[in-house]
Amino acid sequence: MTDPNTLAARFPGDFLFGVATASFQIEGSTKADGRKPSIWDAFCNMPGHVFGRHNGDIACDHYNRWEEDLDLIKEMGVEAYRFSLAWPRIIPDGFGPINEKGLDFYDRLVDGCKARGIKTYATLYHWDLPLTLMGDGGWASRSTAHAFQRYAKTVMARLGDRLDAVATFNEPWCAVWLSHLYGVHAPGERNMEAALAAMHHINLAHGFGVEASRHVAPKVPVGLVLNAHSAIPASDGEADLKAAERAFQFHNGAFFDPVFKGEYPAEMMEALGDRMPVVEAEDLGIISQKLDWWGLNYYTPMRVADDATPGVEFPATMPAPAVSDVKTDIGWEVYAPALHTLVETLYERYDLPECYITENGACYNMGVENGQVNDQPRLDYYAEHLGIVADLIRDGYPMRGYFAWSLMDNFEWAEGYRMRFGLVHVDYQTQVRTVKNSGKWYSALASGFPKGNHGVAKG
C-alpha cells in the first residue's frame, strides 16, 4: 500500500486536497421549500432511462443532514469542498421569481463550511436544469443561456462574498453529447442538431456566467470544469491517427476551442457547421473571456479507431479495445498514464490557466463488513492517479489541487444507486455513513498537509 506520508511529500505545501459532490446526486428533498422539478426528476420517472427507476427524491438526504456531512469533511481533515447549487431550488422555473428558501439553504451550507474552516468551491450547473425551461427547448434554445446568466448573477450576488472559487459548468460534454446526442442523460435526446444547439448555448451560458460573476463578485476566481477525453488512437496507422484527431475535436475541441481560442474546431465545423444554431457576432468573444482557473475531471482513457462505414456521422470513430486488464465495477478501464498524456496535450494545444483535478475516483461496490469497508482497489486507484498528479507538478504543469470523487456514495445518474464512488459508504435504508478504508487513507494524506493560504490566484 502506498504510504500517504510518502505521497504527501511529493506535493507542494500549498496544494489543495478536497472532496466533491453534486446537488441532485446527494440532496434529496426534491419537493422541499419551493424547489420545483429538474429535467432529472422527469427523466428518472420515465421508464427505461435510470436503473431500477431510481430517483433523487431522498438520495443521501444531504438537504437535512448537511451539518453531519460537513462535520465528516472536517473530521477527515480535508481542506476544501466542491459542491453544486440546484438551479430548481433557487429560481424554480428557471426564470421568474427567486426562491429565498432555496438561497437560504446554500447560505447555511456555505456558512457551515466557513465555520469549520472548509474552503468552498461552488459549481453553478451540474446538470439539474429546471424542467420548466424545456418548454422553450432547454439548452437547444438560446433563451436558456440568458436564463442562466440571471441565475448566475443571483447566486453570486448572494454567496460571492464567501466563496473561494466558482465554476460555471460541470462537464459540458455530458450536458451536450451524452444528453442530446447519445440519449443517456436527461433530457434523453438523440439528435445532432439539438446537440450542436446545446453545445453553443452552454458555451454561451458559460461566458454569460463569467460576466455575471465578475460583475457582482469580482474577487471570486471563475473557472470551468471539463471532462477532457484522451482520444488515444488504436494504432499508428494513418486512418486511426486521423480518427483520434477528429475525436479530439469533437469531444474536447467543441468546448476547449471556443473557451480558450475563441473559435470552433475547423474540421468539425467543416463536417457539421451547416447544422449549427445561429452564432451571433459577439458570441465567441463572450465565450472566450480569460478564466482564472480550470478544472479537469478524469476517470478513464478514451481509445478510438477509425470507423470507415460509408456515410457515418462525424467524428467517424469507434471505441478501440482497452490496454489495461484492470477495470472498475462500472466497467471503466484503469490506466493512470493517460492522465499525464492528456494534461500534456491540452497544455500544448491551448493557453490554459492553472488547473485543479476537480474529479477523479473509482467505482467499486464493496459493502460494510464488521463496521469496515475494505475497498483496496479504490485506494490503489487514488494512489496511482495522485502519483501522476505529483509527476505533472514535477514536470512543471500548474496543478493546484485535487478533489476526490466523491465524498460519499450517491445517485450515479443513469446507473441509479447501484454504482458507488464514495470515500464514505452510504446505507440508503438508514442513511448511516461509514468511512471506507480509501477514505481513511485519503484523510491521512489530506490532513497531514500544511494549511496555508491556498486561494486561487486571480489571472
Curated annotation (Swiss-Prot):
Any one GO BP annotation for this protein: cellulose catabolic process
The UniProt record lists the keyword Transcription: no
Any one Gene Ontology molecular-function term assigned to this protein's record: beta-glucosidase activity
InterPro entries on file: Glyco_hydro_1 (IPR001360), Glyco_hydro_1_AS (IPR018120), Glyco_hydro_1_beta-glucosidase (IPR017736), Glyco_hydro_1_N_CS (IPR033132), Glycoside_hydrolase_SF (IPR017853)
Top-level EC class as recorded in UniProt: hydrolase
Keyword match Transmembrane helix: no
Keywords recorded for this protein, A-Z: Carbohydrate metabolism, Cellulose degradation, Glycosidase, Hydrolase, Polysaccharide degradation
Catalytic center residues: 171 (proton donor), 359 (nucleophile)
Residue ranges of the TM segments: none
Catalytic activity: Hydrolysis of terminal, non-reducing beta-D-glucosyl residues with release of beta-D-glucose
Matches recorded under Gene3D superfamilies: Glycosidases
EC number: 3.2.1.21
PANTHER family: GLYCOSYL HYDROLASE, LP05116P
The family this protein is said to belong to: Belongs to the glycosyl hydrolase 1 family.
Protein name: Beta-glucosidase
Organism: Agrobacterium sp. (strain ATCC 21400)
Encoding gene per record: abg
